[in-house]
Amino acid sequence: MEPLREIRNRLLNGWQLSKMHTFEVAARHQSFALAAEELSLSPSAVSHRINQLEEELGIQLFVRSHRKVELTHEGKRVYWALKSSLDTLNQEILDIKNQELSGTLTLYSRPSIAQCWLVPALGDFTRRYPSISLTVLTGNDNVNLQRAGIDLAIYFDDAPSAQLTHHFLMDEEILPVCSPEYAQRHALTNTVINLCHCTLLHDRQAWSNDSGTDEWHSWAQHYAVNLPTSSGIGFDRSDLAVIAAMNHIGVAMGRKRLVQKRLASGELVAPFGDMTVKCHQHYYITTLPGRQWPKIEAFIIWLREQVKTTS
């Protein structure tokens, strides 16, 4: 049996830790040449460091052949243990940095929410938190937050993922909207009689399981209005349907939260008054579990303040 002193001498020390970095790069690439390129060393220098590490640890880490190197069984164990330790260390460093109200914050939102509600208000957030650098991404898919590097997402739906932490943001109502000119041309003011002769503008992806006409169908059913809800023009974003309505193309089913500024400015009108339908869906915020970072919490609090000021 080896003396205890000899075994202890083979445990990691400061000098060996620097060589472990060389080992990690070589193991990741399965190549001394590629490791040398990444580390700005010569292949022979990489090979020398690995040889020294193997000798000091008393473990053969690589099997060398003429054209390639491969990890031994023991080398694989060391590599995965090292990788796990580095990942844990990197996460701890990231968590420490994110305890401050600074750094980057990446947001993901449905395009219509971002364009009509979120982005116009962001100036207030950046004035309050100038040390937080924001990135806003948009899309209609429910993305993998961790894989996409997203800190916080805003969705409009009725089924938050059970794997994520979610926070209610605000509810929503829908109502028909069009341009003043279109309402006058089709005699829509305060009567739905002529609506059946109008072009209906649809958000085909209003929520995850939307059939493509659900908004118009639910409104027509609620008010017992006979409409050809399957006809009209479809868009993959609510704001595009609204833009089409502003350009006198037809009548869109507007989300009240997203169209209220245009109703107030007169760019749009609600020809049938306050004939709204409360949505089963709502706006909610999702984050990864355990991400109670101050900058994320600050943004969620700010979002809720915006809801109060725009209600």
From Swiss-Prot:
Coiled coil: none annotated. Residues 15-72 form the HTH lysR-type domain. Pfam families: HTH_1, LysR_substrate. Keywords: Activator, DNA-binding, Transcription, Transcription regulation. Transmembrane segments: none annotated. One of its GO terms (molecular function) is DNA-binding transcription factor activity. InterPro entries: DsdC (IPR011781), LysR_subst-bd (IPR005119), Tscrpt_reg_HTH_LysR (IPR000847), WH-like_DNA-bd_sf (IPR036388), WH_DNA-bd_sf (IPR036390). The keyword Metal-binding does not apply. Induction: By growth in D-serine. PANTHER family: HTH-TYPE TRANSCRIPTIONAL REGULATOR, HTH-TYPE TRANSCRIPTIONAL REGULATOR DSDC. Regulates the expression of the dsdX-dsdA operon. Belongs to the LysR transcriptional regulatory family. This is HTH-type transcriptional regulator DsdC. It comes from Escherichia coli (strain K12). The lineage of its organism: Bacteria, Pseudomonadati, Pseudomonadota, Gammaproteobacteria, Enterobacterales. The gene is dsdC.
